[in-house]
From Swiss-Prot:
Summary of subunit composition and partner proteins: Monomer.
Protein purpose: Transfers and isomerizes the ribose moiety from AdoMet to the 7-aminomethyl group of 7-deazaguanine (preQ1-tRNA) to give epoxyqueuosine (oQ-tRNA). Seems to have a role in modulation of ADS (arginine deiminase system) gene expression, perhaps exerting a negative effect on the translation of arc regulatory proteins.
Knockout-associated phenotype: The arcA transcript in QueA-deficient strains is 14-fold more abundant than in the wild-type strain. However, no significant difference in arginine deiminase (AD) activity (encoded by arcA) is detected between the wild-type and QueA-deficient strains. The growth rate of a QueA-deficient strain does not differ significantly from that of the wild-type strain, but the QueA-deficient strain does not compete well with the wild-type during serial passage.
Gene Ontology molecular functions: S-adenosylmethionine:tRNA ribosyltransferase-isomerase activity
This enzyme's EC code(s): 2.4.99.17
Induction remark: Is constitutively expressed in the different growth phases. Its transcription is not subject to carbon catabolite repression (CCR), and is not affected by arginine or low pH. Is cotranscribed with arcR.
Chain segments annotated as transmembrane: none
Protein name as annotated: S-adenosylmethionine:tRNA ribosyltransferase-isomerase
Name of the gene: queA
């Protein structure tokens, strides 16, 4: 299949620039794979799609305020660093702008010298490995100096940075939010749990590759980025029990899906506690192992995320659902509306 097979025209005004006042006031397009029918609802009605005994699986990663603005001591040249992943100790892989000024040994100062980065290695595409020096606790320094790394298609400043975190965000490490989870409130989750649905959490730290468009024509030539995931023994045991009892595993978002399916492939359909790096690319033709239904936001044309949805719902039904969403003026991308596919 070709990348062009997953293209569609999206009017720019449908790209949501800010979150809605209430998280669960967003809209929900319910897509039934067996009948091919669509139903326009509000997000809080997702509880009606869940049955007692089902498991709702969510990614509890927390977004780091990973964008740092600093300057080179001596020259005063402005430098932007975007933290991608912690490689070891105080060393991080970062994306640097402008990268050409940052050779090995170069230093960047942030917040009047409260934080200093020294380049220890050069990578391709503007990537660098830097070592940070600071006083105190790194995450606290980052919280005070860093900014939220909002996606490139969001041009408005975020009034409240907690709105780019899920209400259950816990494990620090993402460069982007698992946005399908942004719609849930604590109250809605309590109602879902009271219905007899098991709430299960895993962790996948979302990398920047999630926004990277597919640059090759043939999908077989596309190389996925790697992201770190963890599924605990307790979570795995709950999911095994849910499956054994004939109930559904329902994933919230593509990051939860990629974690579950990575584990399903690794253990041949079984669900075991595991952690490691995944670069799974789910596209049409994929044999599903674990996930029975899922919620997700509306994604970018030609993105690997539209391909993942197409692998579950079929390309034709997926593009038809997107056509419907555009005609009905649904809001797209990170702060946009959601779909539930069953």
């Amino acid at each position: 299949m070709n990348t062009a097979d997953f293209d569609f025209h999206l009017p720019e005004e449908l790209i949501a620039q800010t979150p809605l006042e209430k998280r669960d006031a967003s809209r929900l397009l319910v897509v039934d794979r067996s009948s091919g029918e669509f139903s326009d609802q509000h997000f809080d009605s997702i509880i009606d799609q869940l049955q007692p005994g089902d498991a709702l699986v969510m990614n509890n990663t927390r977004v780091l305020p990973a964008r740092l603005y600093g300057e080179k001591p001596g020259t005063g040249g402005h430098v932007e660093l975007l933290l991608l992943k912690n490689t070891e100790g105080d060393q991080w892989e970062v994306l640097a702008k402008p990268a050409k000024r940052l050779k090995v040994g170069a230093q960047v100062s942030f917040g009047d010298g409260r934080l200093t980065a020294t380049v220890v290695d050069e990578l391709e595409h503007g990537g660098r490995i830097v070592r940070f020096d600071y006083q105190g606790i790194f995450l606290e320094v980052l919280e005070s100096l860093g900014e939220m790394p909002l996606p490139p298609y969001i041009h408005e400043k975020l009034a409240d940075r907690e709105r780019y975190q899920t209400v259950y965000a816990k494990e620090n490490g993402s460069a982007a939010a698992p946005t399908a989870g942004l719609h849930f409130t604590k109250e809605l989750l309590a109602q879902i749990e009271a219905k007899g649905v098991k709430l299960v959490y895993l962790t996948l730290h979302v990398g920047l590759g999630t926004f990277r468009p597919v640059s090759v024509d043939n999908l077989d030539d596309h190389e996925m980025h790697s992201e770190f995931y963890t599924l605990s023994e307790e979570a795995a045991a709950t999911l095994r029990e849910v499956k054994a009892n004939g109930h559904r595993v329902i994933a919230v978002g593509t990051t939860s899906i990629r974690t579950l399916e990575t584990i399903g492939n690794k253990f041949k359909g079984d669900i075991q506690a595991d952690s490691g790096w995944t670069n799974i690319f789910i596209k049409p033709g994929y044999q599903w192992q674990i996930v029975d239904a899922f919620s997700t936001n509306f994604h970018l044309p030609k993105s690997t995320l539209v391909m993942l949805v197409s692998a579950f719902a079929g390309r034709d039904l997926t593009l038809k659902a997107y056509e419907h969403a555009i005609a009905e003026r649904y809001r797209f991308f990170s702060f946009g509306d959601a779909m539930f596919i069953k």
